[in-house]
Amino acid sequence: VKRQEFTFIKKNIGEKETAFTTNLETYMKQYRSIFLKMDIEGGEYDWFKFLNKDESTRNLLDNVTQIVLEIHSLNVQNEQAKSLLKLLFEYFYAIHIHGNNACWFSTPEPDGCQFFNVFEITLLNKRCFNIIEPSNEEFPTNYDMKNTLHNQELYLYTYPFYERIVRCDYDVYKISPWNSVYNDKFEFDI
């Protein structure tokens, strides 16, 4: 269906501009309020190489107001994913995250913590907002749906989404919110 409000460009997203790929530079310079939805099965890392080239390419993110992105293959792209997120978090607030339950978890870090192998994240540009408070909403929310209906949902619970260290007398426990053996919901003070 053709509509004048939309322009469909038959190119893959990547690091370079070619006849078959775009790094979105032209569009990111041309438009000032971009909503970017990207689910390109690992190709986000090639696009990140372009974004991370220099300060001028990174600053193109100022023209993007929202990003909905699926990040893939943390089991093999772990360091690239961390670098990509670090860059995006300089410009954006993460307002939603959902683990793709079809892809389970990445290989555990050396410290034993795990994270989703594939996850969807929604980001809003910081320039559009004053300082926002962290949400106490549990993830997944009632609006989320499983990617695969017959698999268990993947839980992050509430902010902050990192492992918590619990000290009890002389013992120290690392509690991971990512469907570890500590999968139940509970609260505690650190």
Annotated model-derived regions:
Residues 22-23, 44-58:
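Distinct, well-ordered alpha-helical segments
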Residues 13:
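Hydrophobic anchor residue in the Rossmann-like NAD(P) cofactor-binding loop of oxidoreductases
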Residues 35:
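Short, Asp-centered acidic motifs that coordinate Mg2+ and/or phosphate
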Residues 39-43:
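Switch II (G3) loop of P-loop NTPases
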